[in-house]
Structure formats: C-alpha cells, structure tokens
Design a protein with these regions (language model features):
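Active-site loop/helix belt of alpha/beta enzymes
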Residues: 2-5, 10-129, 136-137
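Functionally critical, mid-to-C-terminal surface segments that flank or help form catalytic/ligand
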Residues: 127-173
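Short beta-strand elements bearing conserved aromatic residues within extracellular beta-rich modules
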Residues: 175-177
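Helical hairpin unit composed of two closely spaced alpha helices linked by a short loop
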Residues: 179-182
Length: 183
C-alpha cells in the first residue's frame, strides 16, 4: 500500500499557515512516526521579507530570525526528512538556507529578486491583447505607484495582463511591447 506524501509547513513568521510552536511540531512529528499511510516528503517555511536585504546587500534581521526559528522547529522532526526553505532571494543572499533543495521562483523567469551581479535576463515572452487605448496629457501618471509620468501628450494602451497572471509588479515601466511589428 502506497503512503500519501506530505510536506510539513512551519510558520516561522509569515503568519499564514503552518506549525508555530515546538509543541505543535512535536505532536505532528509523533503522529507521523505512528502513521502507516503518511510519509513526510519535505519540511519547509517561507520568508516574509527575504527580498528586502540590508543596505549592504546582506540578509535582513527578520529573515535571519525566521531561519533560526526554522532550525529550532525542524529539530523536532526526523533529520532524514528533506528540508526546503530558500526561495529566489534566499538562494542569492543566504547559502546557509539551502538545506536539501531550494525553491527558485521569480528567478526562473529571469528577474532577480534582489540586487546582484549575476547576469539575469527575462526568460519568457508574454502574449496578450490591447483592451483599451486612450490619450493622456504631458505630466499625467500611469499605473500603481504612478510609476510612469508622460513626458509629452501621448497615446497609451492597456494590455490584458497583470499580477494575477504572474506579471510581477517590479517589471512595471521596464518591459517592452511589440505591437504590429513595432517595438
């Protein structure tokens, strides 16, 4: 009979889901040890602010605190359970967070989550449709955080793609469009 494979989430400070205390961790560890139909295939956490390094480029104090909390809670479980905590930012800032594997995210698309000298380049192309065209005046702003200011009267277009589609807000005002063969 096959066992269901599960990954155990430890809440180290993001305050979403996961085990928060050593008591909770020990209870789950004991239950897993006795379970005949469940196998822990991994144990992990997620960092709330790993992509916000210190000014010198080092890992911020909150992320270090989360990493230490992970190690404390992780100690309640069998050491043979693979651990994975490093997201894209942690993979660049904290090699001590690699454990058994890392979970690259935004980096896979060619966008560095933190400042780096590594040669990142966008690795995908978006295809969408223009859903709205309008004219704006010089000085008007566009987008979240008013990131773009029109340098002159101009015609702009809204494209049907956004954060919900996986388009990262950090790419705002940096991408290029190709419309009817014109960049």
């Amino acid at each position: 009979q096959k066992k269901a494979q599960v990954h155990i989430k430890l809440d180290t400070g993001m305050n979403r889901i996961g085990l928060r205390t050593e008591d909770e961790a020990r209870q789950v560890a004991c239950a897993l040890a006795e379970a005949k139909n469940i196998k822990a295939a991994g144990i992990y956490t997620h960092f709330a602010a790993a992509d916000e390094p210190m000014e010198d480029g080092s890992l911020n104090a909150y992320s270090r605190q989360q990493l230490e909390r992970f190690k404390q809670l992780r100690a309640c479980f069998d050491e043979s359970i693979p651990a994975h905590v490093a997201n894209s930012a942690m993979s660049l800032l904290a090699p001590e967070a690699y454990f058994s594997m890392i979970r690259e995210g935004i980096s896979l698309y060619g966008y560095p989550p933190v400042k780096t000298d590594l040669p990142f380049a966008p690795a995908l192309t978006w295809r969408s449709e223009i859903v709205h065209i309008k004219n704006i005046s010089r000085g008007e702003t566009v987008g979240y955080g008013r990131i773009f200011t029109a340098p002159r009267d101009m015609r702009i277009a809204t494209v049907a793609v956004g954060h919900g589609d996986g388009y990262h807000r950090a790419a705002s005002n940096r991408g290029e469009m190709l419309v009817q063969g014109k960049r």
